Amino acid sequence: MQRVLELLLLSSTALAVIGDGFIALPVHKLQAGEGSAHFPNRLPIFDVVNGVAKSVEDDVNQIIQPIFGNGIFSGGSIQGTHSGNGHSVKYEVSLPSSSAQKGSNGPSSTDNKDTDPSKTGFSLDDLMNSISTDFWNLIGLNKPPTSSDNGSKDADFTPSAVSQVEQPTSKSVESTAPGSASSASSSSSSEAASSSQPSEDSQPSSSANKKTGAFFLSLDNTQTLYTATLKVGSPAQEVQVMIDTGSSDLWFISSGNSQCKVNGGSIDCDKYGVFDKSKSSSWHDNKTDYSISYYDGDKASGTMGQDNITFADGFSIENANFAVIDNTTSSIGVFGVGYPELEAVKSKYTNLPFAMKEQNLIAKVAYSLYLDSRDAVQGYILFGGIDHAFYTGDLKAFDIVQCNDKYVYSQIPLTSVASSLNNYTNAYGLPAGSNHPKVGAVIYNGTDSFNGGVDLKDTLTLLDTGTTYSYLSKDQVESIVGLYGNVTYNDAGKAYEVPCWVGNPGNYLEFNFKNEQYIKVPTSEFVISVGTYASGAELCVFGILPGTHSILGDNFMRSVYAVFDLEDHVISIAQAAYNDNHAVVPIE
């Protein structure tokens, strides 16, 4: 088996022991312009009134098939052919003799929940033990623990299979799962990557070939928003959309959008791609009008319909509901992953997160977000799973707060914000008229401690990837800015001025959630250079803006690992850990 796995590794197929198949797709970031007023805020404008063991055969099939394809169990060996990345490898893997002796026909084909090896032919532990530790070390993975290792795992997030990934890495992470008081080491290390993608004219897989478990969607960092690439229609058309936890609809810009340059408008619609429904044989127009307005001023109108959407090979939604927009000034569509209550149509429908569970792509309507650092090229949204390598400390769960007895926004209470200043380079000797630091307010002689802060009184706050900056009430923003000196509003930037040195490395804001979780965010995320004073000194404004809704946008979200569970109505958060390792566990 070791030699076969090495051959597969050489053919650019990597392995990871995790849930029943998961895929990684990248998220891209847009480039920021100057100032702050024109960045995306895709919060829709609405008046809101209104752990069971499987049979050994199942376990082994889940592990073998993603690696080798559909092999045949025959006596004490597994035979078959694996194809991928332009390579085809025939294999015959001999099972350990102790296993082969137990049954001439391999594992039982019945749905036997008893995993006793003496009753099922051979055990999953036998298979895992047959792979040498040297091989796991070779590909950069820790050898997965077996029952004989007395290893523990979180009962809420149970790994169940192996999947193909691109970049083998390893990390063992101590973690506490949402809703669980016990801390456990993740029993499966995995690699985030993108599985081989279907060709442009490939058809979405039938439900019989779909995988269940967890899958990544890569998010490309454009500096103002995060974009994901989806394949829609038959044959597939590749279109980028921005990922948005603050809305619920998926919509694509139509090739017929009147605002596109090719149609006489001013928008470069080719930059992120458009959907031409006339070229899709599987498109169905349901004749329902669609219209939505966002707080950043963008609007979109078109019609609702259904078509097939592919995220990665084996992970697709058939007859997904979405809108095709023929009139918008936005250059990119939106992939809303919020509650259905935020849908911009009167008759509610099954949006994509819920359709993923309905069509068995994931076991629970949940996803986790890791945007990585500000300078990172991409982040990830992981549907149906948690990557324990992407955070430090414990995940703390907070109940999502309802709005008028309905789950509408993914909002949790924000208790307070404090500041720590440890780097005073260029803090003094500022020109007259500039925003001098208020000595004694938050300057603690270089110590990493807090003598104060701003009490936000558990303000309900939306965690929103569709918003570039963050928003609090005018009074709250002024209180935070007041920690740094004079409170001056800049009309041109539509934001409050702040001393540029506050953004020095080593300075940070600490966000307190119910005195249970504290997230540190570098102040550089909130200090935005927008020009110069008349004196020539640099002018900066604060990246928490005054608004009617409390929103923690991308400049906060990059510092947190967040798990959105729309089924149990909780959001779990922890301090983000920037690295390239993975330890993925599907949520069951």
From Swiss-Prot:
pH dependence per the UniProt record: Optimum pH is 6.0-7.0, the pH of the saliva, for cleavage of both casein-resorufin and Hst 5.
The UniProt entry, under PANTHER family, shows:
ASPARTIC PROTEINASE 3-RELATED, ASPARTYL PROTEASE-RELATED
- Name of the protein described by the UniProt record: Secreted aspartic protease 7
Q: Which SUPFAM superfamilies match?
A: Acid proteases
Region described as Disordered? 83-124, 144-209
Active site at D244, D464
List glycan-bearing residues. N150, N286, N308, N327, N423, N445, N486
Native source species: Candida albicans
What function is annotated for this protein?
Secreted aspartic peptidases (SAPs) are a group of ten acidic hydrolases considered as key virulence factors. These enzymes supply the fungus with nutrient amino acids as well as are able to degrade the selected host's proteins involved in the immune defense. Plays a key role in defense against host by cleaving histatin-5 (Hst 5), a peptide from human saliva that carries out fungicidal activity. The cleavage rate decreases in an order of SAP2 > SAP9 > SAP3 > SAP7 > SAP4 > SAP1 > SAP8. The cleavage of Hst 5 by SAP7 results mainly in the appearance of the long DSHAKRHHGYKRKFHEKHHSH peptide which is then slowly proeeded to DSHAKRHHGYKR.
Q: Which residues form the propeptide?
A: 17-211
EC category: hydrolase
* Activation and inhibition: Contrary to other SAPs, SAP7 is insensitive to pepstatin A inhibition, which is due restriction of the accessibility of pepstatin A to the active site by Met-242 and Thr-467.
User: Which compartment or compartments is the protein found in?
Assistant: Secreted
Q: Where is the composition biased (Low complexity)?
A: 180-208
